[in-house]
């Protein structure tokens, strides 16, 4: 009986800690719930054109599952490129992303990237402060094969949502694997992305 009472007492003591762990924001960034974020196109250092637009589409879709974060729509970014008289009106690289973020009054933007790391793929992200250009958070995760890239994007998306202050509880309840909410084919995602940019 004494052992059971100790166990119950320990559980009661730890419960508030667990609740704080589950629901706390855990962020020091200047981002509030329902603020806007801009995601640039992927910095593709692999030379594989398959990744040019497909990964942006998958990554933005993954983060857009969050009701905590507002992701600036692709259509709005392309409208800005038109107004900027950009030479390339379908590509949002880091400089273009920064200018669009300034125009839209967005405090932070995300620059994702992919490169080859031996036989693996390195998936990276930078959260950049628009006003200063400073990188305030950066992440790198690895996919063993091309087939693992979407699941790695899922992991990266969850980490970024956490970095922006979303609680673990909200992330767990608003997070479906990309392979369930869209196609698992990067080729199909690329074709879909090209249709959006036309």
Annotate each predicted stretch with a short phrase:
Residues 4-198:
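Acidic, proline/glycine-rich low-complexity intrinsically disordered segments
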């Amino acid at each position: 009986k004494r052992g059971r009472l100790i166990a119950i007492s320990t559980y009661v003591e730890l419960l508030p800690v667990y609740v704080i762990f589950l629901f706390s924001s855990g962020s020091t960034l200047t981002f509030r719930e329902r603020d806007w974020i801009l995601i640039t196109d992927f910095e593709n250092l692999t030379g594989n054109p398959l990744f040019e637009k497909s990964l942006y589409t998958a990554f933005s879709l993954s983060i857009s599952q969050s009701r905590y974060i507002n992701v600036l729509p692709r259509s709005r970014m392309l409208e800005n490129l038109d107004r900027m008289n950009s030479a390339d009106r379908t590509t949002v690289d880091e400089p273009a992303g920064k200018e669009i973020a300034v125009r839209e009054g967005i405090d932070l933007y995300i620059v994702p990237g992919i490169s080859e790391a031996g036989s693996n793929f390195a998936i990276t992200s930078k959260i950049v402060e628009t006003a200063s250009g400073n990188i305030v958070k950066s992440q790198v995760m690895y996919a063993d094969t091309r087939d693992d890239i979407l699941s790695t994007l899922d992991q990266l998306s969850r980490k970024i949502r956490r970095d922006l202050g979303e609680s673990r509880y909200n992330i767990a309840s608003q997070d479906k694997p990309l392979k369930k909410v869209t196609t698992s084919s990067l080729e199909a995602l690329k074709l879909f992305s090209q249709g959006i940019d036309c």
